[in-house]
Design a protein with these regions (language model features):
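A conserved beta-strand->alpha-helix junction
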Residues: 9-29, 126-145, 184-190
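Extended, hydrophobic alpha-helical segments in both membrane/secreted and soluble proteins
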Residues: 57-78
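Extended, composition-driven regions rather than compact fold-specific motifs
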Residues: 138, 156-163, 176-177, 193-198
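Acidic, Ser/Thr-rich peripheral helices and adjacent loops at domain boundaries
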Residues: 101-126
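Conserved small/polar residues in nucleotide/adenosyl-binding loops
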Residues: 203-209
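Short, glycine/charge-rich flexible loops or terminal/linker lids adjacent to PRPP-binding catalytic cores
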Residues: 1-57, 69, 97-110
Length: 213
């Protein structure tokens, strides 16, 4: 139980906050076309050397992790140069599992890192033919009128917990040249509903079409 003394101790705790990464506000990697994105992410951010020690855990907050391109190609490599013990990436949005995220250039599911992580886990656990069966069911489902379409793609995600997919995303984002431990933490759908009880739409998180391509 929390008493006055323990509450005071909790409230007196202050995490150290530094401007470790500096971003050029004029450059936007999310809305850049696929051909130029990888090159652009190399130039968007810079870091403040000496802001953390090698024994520090570094926590960074992102509004969402969609493709994971900027994290993998730029941010993690850049922050790793500061030699933190661990980098924790906190996403205020849940895992984005389906296309048309925010309506911006998201027509291909394989662009989504959550989907790619689920596919990797699925291939480790099941036969390749099982994934092919789901694909065929999706193609068949797409012949129906929109009001009759069922979400077959969930069969790829259902065998795994959110945490298992998050751990796989963490492994995918950590390249061999990253020496720090990397952990990715996502907001949950349940807690998002608590934070935003009257949302306009969560379709890119929970209610997709069945297209795999």
């Amino acid at each position: 139980k929390i008493n006055d003394k323990s509450l005071e101790r909790i409230l007196s705790f202050r995490p150290r906050i530094e401007k470790v990464a500096i971003k050029d506000a004029k450059l936007r990697t999310f809305i850049t076309d696929d051909v130029n994105r990888d090159e652009l992410v190399k130039h968007v951010y810079d870091i403040t050397y000496g802001s953390i020690k090698k024994t520090d855990n570094l926590v960074i907050v992102d509004d969402s992790i969609v493709r994971g391109t900027t994290l993998q190609k730029s941010i993690l490599k850049m922050l790793n140069r500061l030699s933190p013990k661990k980098i924790v990436v906190v996403s205020s949005a849940p895992q984005i599992r389906y296309p048309d995220c925010y309506g911006i250039d998201m027509a291909i599911m394989d662009d989504l890192i959550a989907f790619r992580a689920a596919i990797r886990l699925f291939k480790k656990k099941f036969r390749a033919s099982s994934l092919e069966d789901i694909y065929k069911k999706c193609k068949k489902e797409n012949k129906k009128v929109p009001t009759k379409i069922k979400n077959i793609v969930k069969e790829i995600y259902n065998p795994f917990t959110d945490n298992q997919i998050s751990k796989e995303i963490s492994r995918m984002l950590k390249d061999e040249d990253i020496t720090a431990d990397v952990d990715v933490v996502f907001q949950s759908i349940e807690n998002l509903h608590k934070a935003c009880p009257n949302p306009v739409s969560y379709t890119h998180l929970t209610l997709p079409t069945t297209r795999l391509v």
